[in-house]
Amino acid sequence: MITMKDIIREGNPTLRAVAEEVPVPITEEDRQLGEDMLTFLKNSQDPVKAEELQLRGGVGLAAPQLDISKRIIAVHVPSNDPENETPSLSTVMYNPKILSHSVQDVCLGEGEGCLSVDRDVPGYVVRHNKITVSYFDMAGEKHKVRLKNYEAIVVQHEIDHINGIMFYDHINKENPFALKEGVLVIE
């Protein structure tokens, strides 16, 4: 079971490396890793399990954050509707690639955080509002999905991890809250 002690922190060189492609068909080891990553995210969002296991809440996790330089990401985004228990996006992506993106940019009003970053980093992280992503699932099936808004932001954050990019690399160094005209701010 993955816990916070398994997650490496900023400064570790694995977080700045471009991760290796995962062989398809997916090996049992890589499938299990993906499953464990998704379980961590689900546990981190369950108040009882999160407290019991001392987990910080997360919606995404990339293999490099576990000091494993492979192109594997897991995302578990809860529904916006409090009545709906079904997550809006819950999957493991092997070798995800952004095929296309919108011209429209977006950012979270509260900024972004990261399980590998133990400090608050204020500022807007500007990303594409809509993306089309291809990836392989645990069974080795290829998928192509269109994502927008928060789901697109989460997946871009995790894909950055497999490319050696941290969220704060996107923040304007001179003026962290400067935005170009037309950027949507999601609260």
Curated annotation (Swiss-Prot):
Co-factor binding details: Binds 1 Fe(2+) ion.
Enzyme's top EC category: hydrolase
Positions of disulphide bridges: none
Catalysed reactions, semicolon-separated: N-terminal N-formyl-L-methionyl-[peptide] + H2O = N-terminal L-methionyl-[peptide] + formate
Keyword Hydrolase: yes
Residue numbers binding Fe cation: 114, 157, 161
UniProt-recorded Gene Ontology molecular function terms: metal ion binding; peptide deformylase activity
Keyword Cell membrane recorded: no
NCBIfam families on file: pept_deformyl
Record PANTHER family: PEPTIDE DEFORMYLASE, PEPTIDE DEFORMYLASE 2
UniProt-recorded name of the protein: Peptide deformylase
Source species: Enterococcus faecalis (strain ATCC 700802 / V583)
Classification of source organism: Bacteria, Bacillati, Bacillota, Bacilli, Lactobacillales
